[in-house]
Amino acid sequence: MEKVREIVREGRRVGKEDPRRVVHAFKVGLALALVSSFYYYQPLYDNFGVNAMWAVMTVVVVFEFSVGATLGKGLNRAVATLVAGGLGIGAHHLASLSGPTVEPILLAIFVFVLAALSTFVRFFPRVKARYDYGVLIFILTFALISVSGFREDEILDLAHKRLSTVIMGGVSCVLISIFVCPVWAGQDLHSLLASNFDTLSHFLQEFGDEYFEATEDGDIKEVEKRRRNLERYKSVLNSKSNEEALANFAKWEPRHGQFRFRHPWRQYLAVGALLRQSAYRIDALNSNINSDMQIPMDIKKKIEEPLRRMSSESGKSMKEVSISLKNMTISSSFDIHVVNSQSACKTLSTLLKSGILNDVEPLQMISLMTTVSLLIDIVNLTEKISESVHELASAAKFKNKKKPSKSNSGSIGQAMPNKSHDDDDHVVTILGDVDTSNNVDQSQSHGEISVDSCHHVTIKINDDDSIHDKNEDGDIHVHTNRVSCDHTNASDLLDSGVKKN
């Protein structure tokens, strides 16, 4: 009895995780009930005979969870059955011309050659990804048609009935899959990618609190709960196979919603690959946080501000990308956070060069530099992800994000200036939208700017000595000298720190 209760609980859990699974089960039952009428209804049975069972078999093996998977399998099975049936009839005809003695030998040779070649072709990566099931059905159908034709006089009628029932079963699956609560693989892939961005952004935004705040004895349970929430990123580490399968299924699907035919699904895989690289760094970062060797808090505090900003701004950038993907809009807001994370990286570089950690023990230095190196990697990957997402948005024709019309400019975001920079790196503050209906010549202290568009973005660039205003048409374009973050600063400091200690 306890076993039954456990099965019921498991069924409820699976159904609650994704209610579409329950609907899919009913859809399969409906398809099987429909094609079973070929066998139960006497006029249909008189026409197809026992071959009606091929329709039932087709539903069982073709009906998949998503529309793309069902379409892919259905088309593979139909085309493979048609081609294999034609070749089987041709092989039977050629073999019959050689006489009853040689006929079985030729049929065996034909079956051997085609089965061997087809099986070898299944190892091709492209065939394995999209046509493996079709090649398998081709081998099965050719063997059945050619071999059974040796004992069957009406070989053409046999092939016709099998092909007809297979097509009927496949069409039933496709129609029910598309028109009864459809599940689109393309939509699932799109949602999965947006969810992965959101998951990683959660870790990066919470990293500062986890790394720099000391754990009080009374807060151990709360800290453990927070750590479990942070480890949600692990689902991204193993998402490659799922993403590739969904992208493969999505290629079979017709246009639906905002996903047109020949949607750039390959670009989704490129973005997902970069995201997994970030997840691997985050996994290493999390392991370093939870390692037995912990760095004293007073040492961490020396570089707390830039590290917090690097992780927080990278997390905010990924959060903005997640929102942009969910809404399928083109937004440049996450570029601002990328610039801010690069600015924080430059601040960290300046601090490290100043020798602020010269008194740190070598072993502590190694642990600290591991964290720094991983965060620098994540910042650089965030910039690559931003560029890849822009390519995806352009290829997929995402909508332009609507900008609120304002008569007066107002500050909507600011990147903190860094006074410690050796170079004149610009830090950007976006002031807002400026509406101009006519051509206006604006004279600034550093030159003249001609404004000839209805919508502009005012960008204020803070330098150490002066302030410049800049207007640009259309989307926000941030022009600034991005910092190139690499491992040289961390490795150089580690070498010098070890030598000094």
UniProtKB/Swiss-Prot annotation:
InterPro entries: ALMT (IPR020966). One of its GO terms (cellular component) is membrane. Induction: Up-regulated by aluminum. It is a multi-pass membrane protein. It is found in: Membrane. Residues 398-425 are annotated as: Disordered. The keyword Metal-binding does not apply. Pfam families: ALMT. One of its GO terms (biological process) is malate transport. The keyword Transmembrane applies. The chain crosses the membrane at residues 22-42, 52-72, 78-98, 101-121, 130-150, 166-186. Keywords: Ion channel, Ion transport, Membrane, Transmembrane, Transmembrane helix, Transport. Malate transporter. Belongs to the aromatic acid exporter (TC 2.A.85) family. This is Aluminum-activated malate transporter 2. It comes from Arabidopsis thaliana. The lineage of its organism: Eukaryota, Viridiplantae, Streptophyta, Embryophyta, Tracheophyta.
